[in-house]
Regions:
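Membrane-interface junctions at transmembrane-helix termini in multi-pass inner-membrane proteins
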Residues: 145-168
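Membrane-interface helix-loop junctions in multi-pass transport and translocation proteins
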Residues: 160-164, 174-217
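Alpha-helical transmembrane segments of multi-pass membrane proteins
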Residues: 128-152
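Small-residue-rich midsections of specific transmembrane alpha-helices
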Residues: 56-80, 141-144
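N-terminal membrane topogenesis motif
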Residues: 1-36, 91, 95, 232-254
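Helix-terminus/linker motif at the lipid-water interface of multi-pass membrane proteins
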Residues: 35-52, 123-125, 187, 192, ...
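Short membrane-interface helical motifs at transmembrane helix boundaries
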Residues: 110-133
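Interfacial/gating helices of multi-pass transporter permease domains
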Residues: 42-64, 192, 196-200, 242-247, ...
């Protein structure tokens, strides 16, 4: 007789291995594309070290706000949704997704508006680099779209749809790499701080493209996912929000501390050069 005791585990093991491979490929592709476009724009006439300085300084503030708003979202949502789907509680899974979307859309809106309105004061008083205000203003809208994308990525991860999540990362980075080079070339002849703002506006456009891809992917697959019960969604909003934040905040704190350290280093170096 053939021993079939381990047979049911094989599809799961194969699926897990495929998911890990997809994530690894996506991460490698993102890193390579990111490295290539930074090398290219640094060597574009007029950008150089000055433009790179504005680009990097503004990006540190952006990374800090992303750490506050979105770093812990995918893992927290994926964990909660996977727990619900494992119990076939699809209504509960949809409820978590909707609650998370409301929370982080709100957080993203507030932080995007704050960064846009306070771009110049942050550049002057925090970074000690006045020209970086253009970069911060260009990056501001992307925080909202990153928050939205993070919720969708958590949903797809929790429902074991890793192809969508990995594809979205590669698509976003491909747009960012290509558009950054195109936008910087379009700004040749302008001041380095303006060229830097053009470069970072490509990040905003890329995050919009990534969010749109994830939204369409969700809508296309939504019909295959059992609908949530309407009753109780509003009543359970705050308990569900508390669960999401309890998981997301501790993960975000580590990234926040790291981002603050990098921002302090950047400000210290800038002040030393002055």
């Amino acid at each position: 007789m053939t021993n079939t005791g381990n047979t049911p585990q094989k599809p799961k093991q194969k699926s897990f291995a495929s998911n890990v491979l997809l994530i690894l490929i996506a991460q490698v592709a993102v890193k390579v594309l990111g490295m290539l476009y930074r090398m290219v724009i640094t060597n574009i006439d007029g950008f150089g070290d000055a433009g790179n300085g504005f680009y990097s300084a503004g990006y540190q503030v952006y990374i800090l706000l992303l750490a506050i708003s979105s770093v812990g979202i995918p893992n927290a949502i994926a964990k909660l949704i996977s727990e619900k789907t494992a119990l076939s509680d699809y209504g509960g899974a949809r409820k978590i997704f909707r609650t998370a979307l409301c929370i982080f859309a709100g957080i993203g809106t507030v932080l995007s508006a704050a960064l846009f309105l306070l771009a110049d004061p942050i550049a002057h008083y925090v970074l000690h680099l006045d020209g970086a205000g253009y970069t911060l203003a260009a990056l501001a809208p992307s925080i909202f779209f990153v928050c939205i994308s993070s919720v969708f990525r958590g949903y797809f991860s929790g429902t074991n749809q890793m192809k969508v999540m990995s594809a979205s990362q590669v698509i976003e980075q491909a747009f960012k790499s290509t558009l950054t080079i195109v936008f910087v070339l379009a700004a040749v002849g302008m001041a380095p701080e303006i060229m830097s703002a053009y470069a970072n506006s490509a990040t905003t456009v890329a995050t919009i493209c990534g969010a749109l891809y994830l939204t369409f992917a969700y809508l296309r697959r939504k019909k295959n996912f059992p609908a949530a019960q309407k009753a109780g969604i509003k009543k359970d909003f705050f308990p569900t929000a508390k669960k999401i934040l309890a998981l997301a905040v501790p993960i975000s704190l580590c990234s926040v501390i790291s981002a603050i350290n990098r921002m302090v280093d950047t400000a210290t170096i800038t002040r030393g050069i002055e």
